[in-house]
């Protein structure tokens, strides 16, 4: 017997039918449909919003705000060392990274981190590097220009 993709089916009894709520007492979930009797949770759009604690001041309102989101970090792309291999040519700059679709067009800065391996020598211009990434590029015969 050969198995064909169009003949695949779950085993007999493996799948259970969906519960049809409010369809008679014989179904076991008729009338109130498993919602109990009255109350907010029994209504159509019943339930409380996320974070609601029954009327007491919620934790997100009791605790102070702190910190901030750096706008520079939002515009800085993190580039893996292995992604530099996608760049055509010897020079790696923000423009060449964008041209190779390694960095999004709206990014203003890029930072190369040590992840993966570099297969050829590159000259890195105007891109920040971690110490490990810089050592790996120089070990592969490349150089870093600020």
From Swiss-Prot:
Signal peptide: none
Compositional bias (Gly residues): 23-37
Keyword Ribonucleoprotein belongs to the record: yes
PROSITE patterns (UniProt xref): RIBOSOMAL_L15
Pfam families assigned to the protein according to its UniProt record, in alphabetical order: Ribosomal_L27A
A GO BP annotation: translation
Keywords tagged on the record: Ribonucleoprotein, Ribosomal protein, RNA-binding, rRNA-binding
Family: Belongs to the universal ribosomal protein uL15 family.
NCBIfam families: rplO_bact (TIGR01071)
Subunit-level organization: Part of the 50S ribosomal subunit.
Function: Binds to the 23S rRNA.
Protein name, UniProt field: Large ribosomal subunit protein uL15
Lineage of the species this protein comes from: Bacteria, Pseudomonadati, Pseudomonadota, Gammaproteobacteria, Moraxellales
